[in-house]
Amino acid sequence: MPVEVIPVLHNVSSVQRVVDMARLSYSLGLDTLVVTKAYGGAAQSGVPEAMRLALKLGKSLVVLPELRDAVNLLSPTHVLAVTPSRAERLVGPGGLEGLEGRVLVVFSGGEPELDPSEAAGAIRVYIEGVEGKVGPIAEAALILYFLLRGGGDGRG
């Protein structure tokens, strides 16, 4: 079964972070980006700018109030939570074994990583060979690339 990868940017206030995540996701060939719990500048300017980009490219941007809404509405087979300090599995150039169906990959939009309650029930992952937090856009670039190129076509 092919893998459909959908990135989720959660708990974000930065305009630039939303726009950069949209550019990254769409440039990797992904059709959908989900933004949850956007507030401040991200909600006022980042989401509209990302929506403009999505419409221009024929892609989708889904904006929801909470992470659980994305999980409930998109019904993923797997949820991967990017948690540098509590990773159970590492994602490297070979992708991640055992993934199939729809996979949500949740990146924290702020400096603190995902709260343990937000990552509950998810597979906690980080990047093979990277020590410490490098920021959500760098994490997304590496993890999404590895998932998409490591095994099967994960374009969603």
Curated annotation (Swiss-Prot):
Listed Pfam families: DUF2122 (PF09895)
Top-level taxon of the source organism: Archaea
Catalytic activity from the UniProt record: Endonucleolytic cleavage of DNA to give specific double-stranded fragments with terminal 5'-phosphates
Biological process terms in GO annotation: DNA restriction-modification system
Listed InterPro entries: DUF2122_RecB-nuclease-rel
EC number: 3.1.21.4
UniProt keywords, alphabetically: DNA-binding, Endonuclease, Hydrolase, Nuclease, Restriction system
Enzymatic class: hydrolase
Record GO terms (molecular function): DNA binding; endonuclease activity
Sequence similarity: To M.jannaschii MJ1199.
Function: A putative type II restriction enzyme, its methylase would be APE_2002.
Record protein name field: Putative type II restriction enzyme ApeKORF2002P
